[in-house]
Amino acid sequence: MNTVVRNAIVSDSFDDLRSKQVRFLEEAHKIGFVNVLLWSDALIESITGRLPKFPQEERLYYLQSLRYVDRIRVISNINDPHSLPLPVWDELNPVGWVVDQASDNPQKRLFCASVGMGYQVIPETDLLGFPFRRNDALEAPSGRKKVIVTGCYDWLHSGHVRFFEEVAGLGDLFVVVGSDANVHLLKGASHPMFSQDERRYMVQAIRFVRAALISTGKGWMDAEPEIELIRPDIYAVNEDGDKPEKRRFCVEHGLEYVVLKRLPRAGLPRRESAILRGF
């Protein structure tokens, strides 16, 4: 039951957001404007019998940062995950519920048929891989300063998003994600948890990021080849990423070096990837 949908309705908790969910949102965005019905903390507890891993405000902030999400409404008034609150969005027309193949079931199809709503299933095969988001960021300068940040981003979280948001205020943000080989070299045998392509994909999905690349160098300055390519004006780090090698490189190459405090967005908890790996 696939029908024409220009406004895609997506309903989920989006608790502990991972790449597969982001891939789903990207594919939904190809169908139409993505309108997320985000489950409240109380609704998650009602449906699953447990509190969410991540609180509502943090889940909302993360979703708002994704370039594939157009609007979000927090909901708490459905009896089960196989229905939507009515009216869904009065001003949206035509509208349809978009689900992935694993979430498709007769109850959802019946609900949509009963209220005259479109319904579309995204096949699992469409969610495979981590597409590279091509853009003209390197060839077509915007007139703003270029800012580069580097890191592993092995478990992207709200703290990273806040860092990207702050840095993007300084200029066009380019993120260089550490290669698998270099992360392994710097952090040890159990790193990284996620592949370089998956980590780059998650970073490039953040709307504050103009472009994301994978490093091709080695050591703390593994992004040196990418810096030569991008030619940034500013190298930004947080307190944890402040290294003598980076300071020296910026002095030698005439880059402004900016160190930001490692602070979460107001009202959100401080997050660390090392802790989340065991969350």
At which residue positions do the language-model features occur?
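Nucleotidyltransferase catalytic core that binds NTPs
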Residues: 1-279
